[in-house]
Regions:
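Intrinsically disordered regulatory tails of 7TM GPCRs
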Residues: 1-28, 140, 269-273, 306-348
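Loop architecture of class A 7-transmembrane GPCRs
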Residues: 17-27, 96-111, 134, 144-152, ...
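Extracellular TM2-ECL1-early TM3 structural module of rhodopsin-like
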Residues: 30-38, 42, 68-126, 130-142
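Hydrophobic alpha-helical transmembrane segments of polytopic
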Residues: 37-40, 44, 149-156, 243
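Helix-to-loop junction signature of class
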Residues: 41-45, 58, 82-95, 107, ...
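Cytoplasm-facing ends of alpha-helical transmembrane segments in multi-pass membrane proteins
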Residues: 49-60, 77, 84-88, 112-136, ...
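Juxtamembrane transmembrane-helix termini
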Residues: 58-65, 93, 124-140, 169-177, ...
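Intracellular effector-coupling site of seven-transmembrane GPCRs
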Residues: 152-153, 182-193, 199-207, 219-256, ...
Length: 348
C-alpha cells in the first residue's frame, strides 16, 4: 500500500549544522496517487470481494477439506478478502481521519494479509508437487491431511504476523494540509540500513522465495504429467504456466521498485527530486498492479477447477438463481472421483 508525502528526500539532515534540507514538492504526485488509488482500490475491492466471497461460500457450504491445498485455498481467499477490505478503508482516510490505533491496525492487517497470501500460494504449490510427483508420500499423509493443512495454515499466519510487527508498532497517522496519511514511520534511532533491510525482506519473502518455489514445484509437476502421457496434459500445463506468468507479471514490477528503495537506503545515496517523484509514481502504479492478484487468485486457483465450478453451480441452484445440475448433462463434471494425475490439480 504505497503512500506519498511532502518531505525532504533525505530522512535525516545532512551537511552543515543549521542548514535545512531542500524540500521536494510532491503535491502533483499526491493528487495523482489519491485519484488513482481511489479508483483502483474501489474496483479491486468490488471484484475481489465477489470472487473471494464465492470461494469462501462454496468451501463452507459444500467442501470438506481433504488436503493441504483445500485448506490453503480457503485461507488464501480469506487473506485476499481482508487485504482488499483494508484498501477500501484506506480510501476512506480522506473522509474519516484515522486515529493512532486504527492506523496501526490498518497498516498491520494489510501487511499481515500481504505476506499471508504469498505464504499460502507457496504452500499450495508444494502440496501440488507432493500430490503429483511424490504420490506415495502424499498418500501416506492423506488420512491426516486435513489436520496437517490447518497446522500449515496456522504456521503461515504466525509467520505473517511476525513479519507484520513493524507495521503494527510503527504505523502513524499524519496530516499535511488537507491530506490525511497513514504511514509507517520508523524512529530516527532505527538506522537507514535497518529500514533498507526491512524492504529487502519484503522483496525476498514477497516475491523471490514464492517465485522460486512455485517455478520449481510446477516445473516438476509438468515433467511428471508429460512423462505419464496424461489424456489432457495441455490444458493442465497451460494453467500451471499461467499461474507462474501472472505471478511474475503482477509482482515483479513492484518488487523491483521496493528493491530500488532498499538499495537507496542501504547505499545511503541521494536521489534528485525528479528521481524521487518518479520513484513514488512508480510505487503507486506498480502497487495497484500487485494488488490485482487478489482478484485473479480466485480465477486461477478455484474457478478453473471442475469441482469448484460444480459447487458454484450448486450454490446458485440452492439460491434459486439457476436450474438444478443434472449429473449427466453435456459438459457437466462427473460426480465420480477422478484418478488421473492432473485431477490432483483440479483443473481438468
Amino acid at each position: 500500500m504505497a503512500t506519498t508525502d511532502f518531505y525532504p528526500w533525505e530522512d535525516e539532515y545532512s551537511g552543515q549544522a543549521g542548514v535545512l534540507p531542500e524540500l521536494c514538492e510532491k503535491q502533483a504526485i499526491q493528487g495523482f496517487a489519491r485519484t488513482f488509488q481511489l479508483a483502483v482500490y474501489l474496483l479491486l475491492t468490488v471484484l475481489g470481494t465477489v470472487g473471494n466471497g464465492l470461494v469462501l461460500l462454496t468451501h463452507i457450504r459444500y467442501r470438506q477439506a481433504h488436503s493441504v491445498t483445500d485448506v490453503c485455498l480457503l485461507h488464501l481467499a480469506l487473506s485476499d478478502l481482508l487485504l482488499l477490505l483494508t484498501l477500501s478503508f484506506a480510501d476512506l482516510l480522506q473522509i474519516w481521519p484515522p486515529g493512532a490505533a486504527s492506523c496501526k491496525a490498518l497498516q498491520g492487517i494489510y501487511t499481515l494479509n500481504f505476506y499471508g497470501g504469498f505464504l499460502f500460494l507457496t504452500c499450495i504449490s508444494v502440496d501440488r508437487y507432493a500430490a503429483v510427483v511424490r504420490v506415495p508420500a502424499a498418500w501416506r499423509l492423506h488420512p491426516g491431511a486435513r489436520r496437517q493443512g490447518w497446522l500449515v495454515a496456522g504456521l503461515a499466519w504466525l509467520l505473517a504476523a511476525l513479519l507484520a510487527l513493524p507495521q503494527f508498532i510503527y504505523g502513524q497517522a499524519q496530516q499535511h494540509q488537507d491530506l490525511h496519511l497513514c504511514r509507517v514511520v520508523f524512529p530516527r534511532v532505527v538506522s537507514r540500513a535497518a529500514r533498507g533491510a526491512h524492504n529487502l525482506v519484503q522483496v525476498v519473502l514477497g516475491f523471490a522465495v514464492p517465485f522460486l518455489v512455485m517455478a520449481s514445484c510446477y516445473a516438476a509437476v509438468a515433467r511428471t504429467l508429460l512423462a505419464a502421457r496424461s489424456a489432457q496434459p495441455r490444458r493442465t500445463l497451460r494453467v500451471l504456466l499461467a499461474l507462474v506468468l501472472v505471478f511474475v507479471a503482477l509482482q515483479l514490477p513492484h518488487s523491483l521498485m521496493v528493491l530500488l528503495n532498499a538499495a537507496e537506503l542501504l547505499a545511503s545515496w541521494e536521489m534528485s527530486c525528479a528521481q524521487s517523484r518518479l520513484k513514488d509514481l512508480a510505487l503507486v502504479v506498480t502497487g495497484g498492479l500487485a494488488d490485482l492478484r487478489c482478484c485473479l487468485n480466485p480465477v486461477l486457483y478455484a474457478f478453473l477447477g471442475q469441482r469448484f465450478r460444480r459447487e458454484l453451480w450448486l450454490l446458485f441452484s440452492g439460491a434459486g438463481c439457476v436450474g438444478s445440475l443434472e449429473p449427466r448433462c453435456s459438459g457437466c463434471p462427473s460426480p465420480r472421483r477422478r484418478t488421473s494425475l492432473s485431477s490432483c490439480l483440479d483443473v481438468e
